[in-house]
């Protein structure tokens, strides 16, 4: 499994998990976060490997569709880059650093 795809799916899952069904959440979390094989997930839920595979592929598409429409992950990346640039440019500005910490904590709650 590609590490970039795994990282992206884990990130999208963090942002959009609440919009998935319980089964979709379970399969994606086991497959991407816990590194279970299709066979292990199938055994855990008493279904075929093909059923697990189909569900995971559908859920990947759903997560990508949510990101295409809502842009929560890509916006988070842009905000993080901007915060890093500001902190790098103004390392001694305590007020600015406090404000960025507040904004970062808001991002972490969502």
UniProtKB/Swiss-Prot annotation:
InterPro entries: RNA_pol_sigma_r3/r4-like, UPF0122, UPF0122_fam_protein, WH-like_DNA-bd_sf
UniProt feature coiled coil, ranges: none
Pfam families, per database record: UPF0122
Database matches in Gene3D superfamilies: Winged helix-like DNA-binding domain superfamily/Winged helix DNA-binding domain (1.10.10.10)
Family annotation (NCBIfam families): PRK00118.1-1 (NF001066), PRK00118.1-4 (NF001068), PRK00118.1-6 (NF001070), YlxM (NF045758)
Family: Belongs to the UPF0122 family.
Function: Might take part in the signal recognition particle (SRP) pathway. This is inferred from the conservation of its genetic proximity to ftsY/ffh. May be a regulatory protein.
Name of the featured protein: UPF0122 protein SPG_1182
Species per Swiss-Prot/TrEMBL record: Streptococcus pneumoniae serotype 19F (strain G54)
Organism lineage: Bacteria, Bacillati, Bacillota, Bacilli, Lactobacillales
């Amino acid at each position: 499994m590609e590490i970039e795809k795994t990282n992206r799916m884990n990130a999208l899952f963090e942002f959009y998990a609440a919009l998935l069904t319980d089964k979709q959440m379970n399969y994606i979390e086991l497959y991407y976060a816990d590194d279970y094989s299709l066979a292990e997930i199938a055994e855990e839920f008493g279904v075929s490997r093909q059923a697990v595979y189909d569900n995971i592929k559908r859920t990947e598409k759903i997560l990508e569709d949510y990101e295409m429409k809502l842009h929560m992950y890509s916006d988070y990346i842009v905000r993080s880059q901007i915060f890093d640039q500001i902190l790098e440019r103004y390392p001694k500005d305590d007020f600015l650093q406090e404000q960025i910490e507040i904004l970062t904590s808001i991002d972490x709650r969502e």
